Amino acid sequence: MAKVGKNYQEAVKAFDRAALHEPMEALAVVKKIAKAKFDETVEVAFKLGIDTRHADQQIRGALVLPHGTGKTRSVLVFAKGDKAKEAEAAGADFVGAEDMIAKIEQGWFGFDVVVATPDMMGMVGKLGRVLGPKGLMPNPKTGTVTFDVAKAVKEIKAGKIEYRADKAGIIHAPIGKVSFSEEQLYQNYKVLVETLVKAKPAAAKGQYIRSVTVSSTMGPGVRINPVKAN
């Protein structure tokens, strides 16, 4: 743990933490100061000018990053009949119905994303207490409740991510790994920013993107100028 602390302290000294960087510059700094012995995830945090106490200012959705996240996610699909076959053909890791529900009720969570056809949601809804807290409950807003299970699975495997503003109006999202090139990270970042701008609630007042910070898994946050966020 001391070694991790030492690396972090060295990283902090390597740049001006108060400075507001251009996006590409910030990403270059994050890559430069990443010292962990594993391929760290690069994550962006956006503080938005929204009041999530109001239903019309809650932001949630999904998008496909052009270069993916660098991580292959395992997908569980709740479907029957032809839809189950379509999910399997598209590359779903687990496909089932009552059998999968029984496994989850027994404590199994060997998957990263859950997709369900609409007709299965009555059954899947019973798992809300265990899937909800883990952020695994299928939702139409993120495209995980759909009859087009093949498309959903392929998009997730291609690098689809979900985003959601927390109570403080902050959105955290991965945009790749430190092994990605600066250009790949920037292109992923740019698509994310454009998506969030399009998702701006009509009721939101004042500056929308208040602050932006990018960091690697074990590294300190590098600030991006919110005025030049994209």
Curated annotation (Swiss-Prot):
Keywords: Repressor, Ribonucleoprotein, Ribosomal protein, RNA-binding, rRNA-binding, Translation regulation, tRNA-binding
Coiled-coil annotated residue ranges, if any: none
Gene3D superfamilies linked: 3.30.190.20, 3.40.50.790
Stored InterPro entries: Ribosom_uL1_bac-type, Ribosomal_uL1, Ribosomal_uL1-like, Ribosomal_uL1/biogenesis, Ribosomal_uL1_3-a/b-sand, Ribosomal_uL1_CS
Signal peptide positions (record): none
Record-level Gene Ontology MF annotations: rRNA binding; structural constituent of ribosome; tRNA binding
Pfam families: Ribosomal_L1 (PF00687)
Gene Ontology terms: cellular component: large ribosomal subunit
Record GO biological process: regulation of translation; translation
Family (UniProt): Belongs to the universal ribosomal protein uL1 family.
Function recorded in the entry: Binds directly to 23S rRNA. The L1 stalk is quite mobile in the ribosome, and is involved in E site tRNA release.
Complex and partners: Part of the 50S ribosomal subunit.
Entry-linked NCBIfam families: rplA_bact
HAMAP family the record matches: Ribosomal_uL1_B
Protein name: Large ribosomal subunit protein uL1
Classification of source organism: Bacteria, Bacillati, Bacillota, Clostridia, Eubacteriales
